[in-house]
């Protein structure tokens, strides 16, 4: 049996007392260096952390009190990473489809100026994060405005996000430009 105990669970008393859940599917993509695809296998999870991957029978034997959920005709795989997102822009979906970059900017930038506020970015980011998680994306690198709001929205949804400050040649929707934006970033 292939088993990987995550270090966060090995020393945590509460994690060790958490119930074990076993998930199985027709196929498990390990995304290892050999692109191994497992069949008749499962993943054991405790306190939200994968603690073992291996043959289903072995995991059920090792964790007799675990709950087991099988996904017929399905694939279990690691979450995907979207390394270039503008999550908050989901509010403009359909506004400038099938346009070249300049046409896109000519349509979207005035719309952004009219509606970009913390609340609109929060709602749009949460909607995009929910859609992303539903599609198997667990992590995003987001480049948009109000990074603290983006982090909070993704946290509410349960999606990891990396983001940072957007710098423009003028005052942006956050009400800061140039050195004020840099000072805010450094705090």
Regions found by a protein language model. Give the residues of each.
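Short capping/connector residues at structural and topological boundaries
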Residues: 33-34, 43, 81-82, 92, ...
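Alpha-helical scaffold segments that flank or form the walls of functional sites
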Residues: 93-159, 186-187
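N-terminal metal-binding scaffold of metallo-dependent hydrolase/deaminase domains
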Residues: 1-62, 75
């Amino acid at each position: 049996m292939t088993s990987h105990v995550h270090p966060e669970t090995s020393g945590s008393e509460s994690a060790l007392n958490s119930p074990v859940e076993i998930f199985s599917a027709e196929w498990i993509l390990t995304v290892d260096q050999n692109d191994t695809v497992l069949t008749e296998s499962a993943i054991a999870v405790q306190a939200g952390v994968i603690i073992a991957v291996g043959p289903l029978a072995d995991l059920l034997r090792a964790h007799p009190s675990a709950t087991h959920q099988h996904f017929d005709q399905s694939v279990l795989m690691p979450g995907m990473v979207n390394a270039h997102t503008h999550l908050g822009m989901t509010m403009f979906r359909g506004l400038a489809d099938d346009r070249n970059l300049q046409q896109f900017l000519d349509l979207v930038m005035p719309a952004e100026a009219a509606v970009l506020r913390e609340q609109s970015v929060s709602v749009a980011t949460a909607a995009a994060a929910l859609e992303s998680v539903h599609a198997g994306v667990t992590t995003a690198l987001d480049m948009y405005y109000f990074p603290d709001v983006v982090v909070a929205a993704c946290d509410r949804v349960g999606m990891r996000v990396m983001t940072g400050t957007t710098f423009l040649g003028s005052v942006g929707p956050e009400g800061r430009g140039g050195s004020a934006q840099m000072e805010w970033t450094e705090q």
